[in-house]
Amino acid sequence: MGETRHFFLTGCASGIAKHLTGVLLGQGHSVFATDVNLEALENAAREGAWPVERVRLRALDVRDADAWENVFAEAVREFGHIDICMNIAGLLLAAWATDQPINEVHSQIDVNVKGVIFGTRVAARHMVLRGKGHIINIASIAGLTPVPGMAVYAATKYAVRAYSISACMELRKKGVYVTAICPASVQTPMLDGQLHNDAADLFYSGYRMLTVDEIEHAIFKRAMRRRPPYEVHVPRLKTKLAKFVDNFPAVGPIFAPLYQWSGRRRQAQRRAEEQRAK
């Protein structure tokens, strides 16, 4: 990625953001790493031997707009400026449309949508003043196609994608770019938490899960270009099918049973592996 840069990341205690934090620090960059769970974030830093001179660890509840203002301002004071902000923190709680508890509706919308909007808003204001910067928002394949069993989650990821592309249209002329990353299922603790949830079967479909290394490649090689794209789909073939179903939703019920069968089979295999490991 050339010269060293200053990054601001959310959700760094686990999953994609934890992996990216370690990679960025290994490349010599500085990272302002945040998570709602500071203790888990500190544990991740110790486990990864993150260099204290180039990383700052702070608690951040992405649902709190005032917290965003304060923590991002601290990051600017610490590093002088932020080159790239990655809104990665997310929440997946699968449930059938008739059964999703109200608190889960609120929590997914608050974390996945409001968290990204608050973060993009704060980072964009800082970057516009500098005349340059890049904001990367993690959406999902669920932002490209309807997903039975995850109606609320899919709605939040559609919102993240639409917001990111709309904001990019506004900001590009000011030197600031926004890119939405839309991956298929990624093997992370967030997805592991849905292993025993039958409503999440579609997210376990397909011949394999993406790895955090593949998301790293998509971000570093495809998103972080001199002129960043509006969105990046990972992998290309599966997301093309998702876009097709989005354009022609009536074909969804034709494909869905096959993918649900595949997902349930994979869930059963993973559950059996979990039992054997105990």
Describe the predicted segments one by one.
Residues T120, T156:
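Active-site helix of classical SDR
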Residues A59-N70, I102:
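The beta1-alpha1 cofactor-binding region of Rossmann-like NAD(H)/NADP(H)-dependent oxidoreductases
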Residues Q27-N43:
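Conserved glycine-rich Rossmann-like NAD(P)H-binding loop of the short-chain dehydrogenase/reductase
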Residues G2-F32:
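Canonical Rossmann dinucleotide-binding motif of NAD(H)/NADP(H)-dependent dehydrogenases/reductases
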Residues S140:
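Residue(s) in the substrate-gating loop at a strand-loop-helix junction
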Residues W96-A97, P101-I109:
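Substrate-binding pocket helix/loop in short-chain dehydrogenase/reductase
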Residues R172-R236:
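SDR active-site lid
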